Amino acid sequence: MATSDSEFNSDLLLAHKLPETRYTYNERDVAIYALGIGACGQDAVDSDELKFVYHRNGQDLIQVLPTFASLFTLGSLTEGLDLPGFKYDPSLLLHGQQYIEIYRPLPSKASLINKVSLAGLQDKGKAAILELETRSYEEGSGELLCMNRTTVFLRGAGGFSNSSQPFSYKNYPSNQGLAVKIPQRQPLTVCEERTQPSQALLYRLSGDYNPLHSDPEFAKLAGFPRPILHGLCTLGFAIKAIIKCVCKGDPTAVKTISGRFLTTVFPGETLITEMWLEGLRVIYQTKVKERNKTVLAGYVDIRGLSSSL
Protein backbone atom coordinates (compact mmCIF):
# COMPACT_ATOMS: atom_id res chain seq x y z
CA MET A 1 0.00 0.00 0.00
CA ALA A 2 1.14 3.53 -0.65
CA THR A 3 2.28 5.55 2.33
CA SER A 4 1.91 9.30 2.72
CA ASP A 5 2.74 12.10 5.08
CA SER A 6 -0.79 13.44 4.62
CA GLU A 7 -4.08 12.20 3.24
CA PHE A 8 -4.13 11.92 -0.54
CA ASN A 9 -5.77 14.99 -2.07
CA SER A 10 -6.40 14.97 -5.80
CA ASP A 11 -6.80 18.76 -5.96
CA LEU A 12 -3.38 19.27 -4.38
CA LEU A 13 -1.87 16.65 -6.67
CA LEU A 14 -3.21 18.17 -9.88
CA ALA A 15 -2.19 21.68 -8.82
CA HIS A 16 1.32 20.56 -7.84
CA LYS A 17 4.15 21.90 -10.02
CA LEU A 18 7.11 19.61 -10.57
CA PRO A 19 10.54 21.27 -10.67
CA GLU A 20 12.33 21.88 -13.94
CA THR A 21 15.41 19.78 -14.63
CA ARG A 22 18.47 20.40 -16.79
CA TYR A 23 20.27 18.05 -19.14
CA THR A 24 23.53 18.84 -20.93
CA TYR A 25 25.23 16.59 -23.45
CA ASN A 26 27.91 16.66 -26.14
CA GLU A 27 29.12 14.64 -29.13
CA ARG A 28 30.85 12.08 -26.92
CA ASP A 29 27.57 11.32 -25.12
CA VAL A 30 25.81 10.91 -28.46
CA ALA A 31 28.44 8.43 -29.70
CA ILE A 32 28.46 6.42 -26.46
CA TYR A 33 24.67 6.16 -26.62
CA ALA A 34 24.79 4.92 -30.22
CA LEU A 35 27.31 2.23 -29.25
CA GLY A 36 25.08 1.33 -26.31
CA ILE A 37 22.19 0.46 -28.62
CA GLY A 38 24.34 -1.60 -30.95
CA ALA A 39 25.58 0.87 -33.57
CA CYS A 40 28.48 -0.74 -35.46
CA GLY A 41 28.18 -3.75 -33.15
CA GLN A 42 28.00 -6.18 -36.06
CA ASP A 43 30.23 -4.24 -38.47
CA ALA A 44 32.55 -1.44 -37.31
CA VAL A 45 32.56 0.19 -40.77
CA ASP A 46 28.82 -0.06 -41.50
CA SER A 47 28.16 3.28 -43.23
CA ASP A 48 24.51 3.24 -42.11
CA GLU A 49 25.60 3.25 -38.46
CA LEU A 50 29.09 4.76 -38.37
CA LYS A 51 27.57 8.23 -38.88
CA PHE A 52 26.07 7.98 -35.37
CA VAL A 53 29.53 7.47 -33.87
CA TYR A 54 32.08 9.22 -36.12
CA HIS A 55 32.42 11.90 -38.80
CA ARG A 56 35.65 12.54 -40.68
CA ASN A 57 35.08 16.30 -40.63
CA GLY A 58 34.52 16.52 -36.89
CA GLN A 59 32.45 14.93 -34.15
CA ASP A 60 30.06 17.88 -34.11
CA LEU A 61 28.76 16.59 -37.47
CA ILE A 62 27.73 13.14 -36.25
CA GLN A 63 24.02 12.36 -36.52
CA VAL A 64 21.85 11.80 -33.47
CA LEU A 65 19.47 8.88 -33.13
CA PRO A 66 15.97 10.04 -32.14
CA THR A 67 15.79 7.66 -29.17
CA PHE A 68 18.67 9.61 -27.62
CA ALA A 69 15.85 11.90 -26.48
CA SER A 70 14.75 9.23 -24.00
CA LEU A 71 17.84 10.05 -21.91
CA PHE A 72 16.51 13.52 -21.15
CA THR A 73 14.06 12.03 -18.64
CA LEU A 74 16.68 10.20 -16.56
CA GLY A 75 16.44 10.77 -12.82
CA SER A 76 12.89 12.13 -12.63
CA LEU A 77 11.38 8.77 -11.68
CA THR A 78 14.27 6.73 -10.34
CA GLU A 79 15.06 9.31 -7.66
CA GLY A 80 11.44 9.54 -6.54
CA LEU A 81 8.95 12.38 -6.99
CA ASP A 82 7.50 14.67 -4.37
CA LEU A 83 3.79 14.28 -5.11
CA PRO A 84 1.27 15.36 -2.45
CA GLY A 85 0.04 12.30 -0.57
CA PHE A 86 1.68 9.83 -2.93
CA LYS A 87 4.95 8.02 -2.29
CA TYR A 88 6.57 5.04 -3.96
CA ASP A 89 9.69 2.94 -3.75
CA PRO A 90 11.83 3.64 -6.87
CA SER A 91 13.41 0.17 -6.57
CA LEU A 92 9.98 -1.40 -7.30
CA LEU A 93 9.51 0.58 -10.52
CA LEU A 94 8.86 -1.26 -13.80
CA HIS A 95 9.07 0.64 -17.09
CA GLY A 96 5.88 0.00 -19.05
CA GLN A 97 5.89 2.32 -22.04
CA GLN A 98 7.78 5.16 -23.71
CA TYR A 99 6.22 7.70 -26.06
CA ILE A 100 8.39 10.30 -27.82
CA GLU A 101 7.60 13.16 -30.18
CA ILE A 102 10.52 14.73 -32.08
CA TYR A 103 9.87 18.29 -33.26
CA ARG A 104 13.25 18.99 -34.87
CA PRO A 105 16.47 17.01 -35.45
CA LEU A 106 18.42 16.66 -32.22
CA PRO A 107 21.71 18.59 -32.25
CA SER A 108 24.98 16.80 -31.51
CA LYS A 109 25.40 18.89 -28.34
CA ALA A 110 23.00 20.97 -26.30
CA SER A 111 22.00 22.31 -22.91
CA LEU A 112 18.34 21.63 -22.24
CA ILE A 113 15.68 22.73 -19.80
CA ASN A 114 13.13 20.01 -19.09
CA LYS A 115 9.63 20.98 -18.00
CA VAL A 116 8.10 18.00 -16.23
CA SER A 117 4.39 17.49 -15.55
CA LEU A 118 2.08 14.75 -14.34
CA ALA A 119 0.42 13.15 -17.37
CA GLY A 120 -1.41 10.34 -15.59
CA LEU A 121 -1.88 8.45 -12.34
CA GLN A 122 -4.07 5.42 -11.72
CA ASP A 123 -4.70 3.48 -8.52
CA LYS A 124 -4.67 -0.23 -9.37
CA GLY A 125 -5.11 -1.53 -5.83
CA LYS A 126 -1.79 -3.16 -5.02
CA ALA A 127 0.05 -1.09 -7.60
CA ALA A 128 -0.15 2.23 -9.40
CA ILE A 129 0.49 3.44 -12.93
CA LEU A 130 2.32 6.77 -13.10
CA GLU A 131 2.90 8.80 -16.27
CA LEU A 132 5.22 11.77 -16.59
CA GLU A 133 5.49 14.16 -19.52
CA THR A 134 8.82 15.87 -20.14
CA ARG A 135 9.15 18.70 -22.66
CA SER A 136 12.75 19.54 -23.52
CA TYR A 137 13.67 23.08 -24.56
CA GLU A 138 17.04 24.24 -25.86
CA GLU A 139 18.53 26.64 -23.34
CA GLY A 140 19.09 30.06 -24.85
CA SER A 141 16.81 29.82 -27.88
CA GLY A 142 13.95 28.29 -25.89
CA GLU A 143 13.10 26.09 -28.86
CA LEU A 144 11.11 22.94 -28.07
CA LEU A 145 13.07 19.90 -29.28
CA CYS A 146 11.02 16.94 -28.13
CA MET A 147 8.51 15.49 -25.69
CA ASN A 148 8.77 12.25 -23.72
CA ARG A 149 5.90 10.53 -21.95
CA THR A 150 7.12 7.82 -19.62
CA THR A 151 4.73 5.24 -18.18
CA VAL A 152 5.81 3.16 -15.20
CA PHE A 153 4.17 0.43 -13.11
CA LEU A 154 4.82 0.97 -9.40
CA ARG A 155 4.55 -2.21 -7.36
CA GLY A 156 3.21 -1.70 -3.86
CA ALA A 157 2.16 1.91 -4.49
CA GLY A 158 -1.59 1.40 -4.94
CA GLY A 159 -4.40 1.81 -2.45
CA PHE A 160 -3.95 5.56 -2.01
CA SER A 161 -7.46 6.57 -3.13
CA ASN A 162 -9.56 8.13 -0.38
CA SER A 163 -12.90 7.03 -1.83
CA SER A 164 -14.48 3.80 -3.05
CA GLN A 165 -13.77 4.88 -6.62
CA PRO A 166 -10.10 4.23 -7.52
CA PHE A 167 -8.31 7.43 -8.49
CA SER A 168 -7.68 7.76 -12.23
CA TYR A 169 -6.24 10.77 -14.04
CA LYS A 170 -4.97 11.14 -17.59
CA ASN A 171 -4.07 14.39 -19.33
CA TYR A 172 -3.24 13.62 -22.95
CA PRO A 173 -5.07 12.57 -26.15
CA SER A 174 -6.46 9.04 -25.94
CA ASN A 175 -5.03 8.08 -29.34
CA GLN A 176 -1.40 8.62 -28.26
CA GLY A 177 0.58 5.54 -27.33
CA LEU A 178 -2.24 3.05 -27.78
CA ALA A 179 -1.39 -0.63 -27.95
CA VAL A 180 -0.94 -1.59 -31.59
CA LYS A 181 -2.59 -4.44 -33.42
CA ILE A 182 0.08 -6.49 -35.17
CA PRO A 183 -0.93 -7.23 -38.80
CA GLN A 184 -1.53 -10.86 -39.73
CA ARG A 185 0.26 -10.50 -43.07
CA GLN A 186 3.96 -11.01 -43.63
CA PRO A 187 6.10 -8.06 -42.50
CA LEU A 188 7.52 -5.61 -45.02
CA THR A 189 11.00 -6.28 -43.68
CA VAL A 190 12.75 -7.99 -40.78
CA CYS A 191 15.99 -7.05 -39.00
CA GLU A 192 17.96 -9.47 -36.83
CA GLU A 193 20.66 -8.20 -34.49
CA ARG A 194 22.47 -9.90 -31.64
CA THR A 195 23.07 -7.92 -28.47
CA GLN A 196 26.43 -8.27 -26.78
CA PRO A 197 26.86 -9.98 -23.38
CA SER A 198 28.16 -6.62 -22.13
CA GLN A 199 25.34 -4.59 -23.75
CA ALA A 200 23.73 -3.45 -20.49
CA LEU A 201 27.12 -2.45 -19.05
CA LEU A 202 27.77 -0.31 -22.12
CA TYR A 203 24.28 1.21 -22.20
CA ARG A 204 24.44 2.20 -18.52
CA LEU A 205 27.27 4.61 -19.39
CA SER A 206 24.56 6.84 -20.87
CA GLY A 207 23.26 7.50 -17.36
CA ASP A 208 20.88 4.72 -16.31
CA TYR A 209 22.78 3.19 -13.40
CA ASN A 210 19.99 1.01 -12.00
CA PRO A 211 21.85 -2.01 -10.51
CA LEU A 212 19.17 -4.32 -11.91
CA HIS A 213 21.12 -4.09 -15.18
CA SER A 214 24.61 -4.66 -13.78
CA ASP A 215 24.62 -6.30 -10.33
CA PRO A 216 24.00 -10.09 -10.32
CA GLU A 217 22.99 -10.16 -6.65
CA PHE A 218 20.58 -7.25 -7.05
CA ALA A 219 19.03 -8.94 -10.10
CA LYS A 220 18.49 -12.16 -8.13
CA LEU A 221 16.79 -10.26 -5.32
CA ALA A 222 14.47 -8.79 -7.95
CA GLY A 223 13.61 -12.28 -9.22
CA PHE A 224 15.86 -12.52 -12.28
CA PRO A 225 18.59 -15.11 -12.83
CA ARG A 226 21.00 -12.40 -13.98
CA PRO A 227 21.01 -8.69 -14.90
CA ILE A 228 18.54 -7.72 -17.60
CA LEU A 229 18.84 -5.30 -20.50
CA HIS A 230 17.38 -1.81 -20.11
CA GLY A 231 14.00 -1.52 -21.82
CA LEU A 232 15.08 1.73 -23.45
CA CYS A 233 18.12 -0.08 -24.86
CA THR A 234 15.82 -2.61 -26.53
CA LEU A 235 13.72 0.29 -27.86
CA GLY A 236 16.88 1.88 -29.26
CA PHE A 237 17.77 -1.32 -31.12
CA ALA A 238 14.27 -1.51 -32.62
CA ILE A 239 14.09 2.12 -33.76
CA LYS A 240 17.62 1.93 -35.17
CA ALA A 241 16.45 -1.06 -37.24
CA ILE A 242 13.45 0.90 -38.53
CA ILE A 243 15.65 3.85 -39.50
CA LYS A 244 17.97 1.51 -41.39
CA CYS A 245 15.35 -0.66 -43.09
CA VAL A 246 12.41 1.71 -43.69
CA CYS A 247 13.74 5.28 -43.41
CA LYS A 248 16.75 4.62 -45.68
CA GLY A 249 19.14 5.50 -42.87
CA ASP A 250 17.67 8.96 -42.21
CA PRO A 251 17.10 9.51 -38.46
CA THR A 252 15.34 12.83 -39.11
CA ALA A 253 12.47 10.95 -40.78
CA VAL A 254 11.25 9.81 -37.36
CA LYS A 255 8.41 11.96 -36.02
CA THR A 256 6.82 9.90 -33.24
CA ILE A 257 7.90 6.78 -31.34
CA SER A 258 5.72 4.55 -29.19
CA GLY A 259 6.93 1.38 -27.52
CA ARG A 260 5.40 -0.98 -24.94
CA PHE A 261 7.75 -3.19 -22.96
CA LEU A 262 6.24 -6.67 -22.74
CA THR A 263 8.92 -8.78 -21.07
CA THR A 264 12.62 -8.76 -20.29
CA VAL A 265 15.66 -9.19 -22.53
CA PHE A 266 18.96 -10.63 -21.31
CA PRO A 267 22.23 -9.23 -22.69
CA GLY A 268 23.62 -11.52 -25.38
CA GLU A 269 20.22 -12.48 -26.79
CA THR A 270 19.26 -11.89 -30.42
CA LEU A 271 16.58 -9.33 -31.27
CA ILE A 272 14.36 -9.80 -34.31
CA THR A 273 12.37 -6.69 -35.27
CA GLU A 274 9.48 -7.16 -37.71
CA MET A 275 8.07 -4.10 -39.49
CA TRP A 276 4.83 -3.34 -41.32
CA LEU A 277 4.11 -0.11 -43.19
CA GLU A 278 0.62 1.41 -42.97
CA GLY A 279 0.66 4.82 -44.65
CA LEU A 280 3.26 6.88 -42.79
CA ARG A 281 3.17 4.62 -39.75
CA VAL A 282 5.55 1.73 -39.15
CA ILE A 283 4.07 -0.90 -36.85
CA TYR A 284 6.73 -3.10 -35.30
CA GLN A 285 7.32 -5.86 -32.82
CA THR A 286 10.60 -7.14 -31.46
CA LYS A 287 11.16 -10.74 -30.42
CA VAL A 288 13.95 -12.58 -28.65
CA LYS A 289 15.05 -15.28 -31.08
CA GLU A 290 16.38 -17.71 -28.49
CA ARG A 291 13.12 -17.82 -26.49
CA ASN A 292 10.63 -16.87 -29.25
CA LYS A 293 9.17 -14.20 -26.96
CA THR A 294 7.78 -10.83 -28.05
CA VAL A 295 9.49 -8.27 -25.83
CA LEU A 296 8.48 -4.95 -27.38
CA ALA A 297 5.73 -3.65 -29.67
CA GLY A 298 4.70 -0.25 -30.92
CA TYR A 299 4.74 2.15 -33.82
CA VAL A 300 6.82 4.89 -35.42
CA ASP A 301 5.27 7.75 -37.37
CA ILE A 302 7.54 9.06 -40.11
CA ARG A 303 7.64 12.34 -42.01
CA GLY A 304 7.77 10.91 -45.51
CA LEU A 305 9.10 8.19 -47.76
CA SER A 306 10.48 8.05 -51.26
CA SER A 307 8.32 6.30 -53.81
CA SER A 308 11.01 3.66 -54.34
CA LEU A 309 10.34 1.92 -51.00
From Swiss-Prot:
A motif (Microbody targeting signal) lies at residues 307-309. Keywords: Fatty acid metabolism, Lipid metabolism, Lyase, Oxidoreductase, Peroxisome. This is Enoyl-CoA hydratase 2, peroxisomal. GO terms for cellular component: mitochondrion; peroxisome. It is found in: Peroxisome. Bidirectional monofunctional enoyl-CoA hydratase 2 involved in the degradation of even cis-unsaturated fatty acids. Devoid of 3-hydroxyacyl-CoA dehydrogenase activity. Substrate binds at H95, G96, K124, D208, Y209, N210, P211, L212, H213, G231, F261. Residues 183-295 form the MaoC-like domain. Pathway: Lipid metabolism; fatty acid beta-oxidation. It comes from the Eukaryota. Ubiquitous. It catalyses: a (3R)-3-hydroxyacyl-CoA = a (2E)-enoyl-CoA + H2O. GO terms for biological process: fatty acid beta-oxidation, unsaturated, even number. Pfam families: MaoC_dehydratas, MFE-2_hydrat-2_N. It is an enzyme of class 4 (lyase). One of its GO terms (molecular function) is oxidoreductase activity. Its EC number is 4.2.1.119.
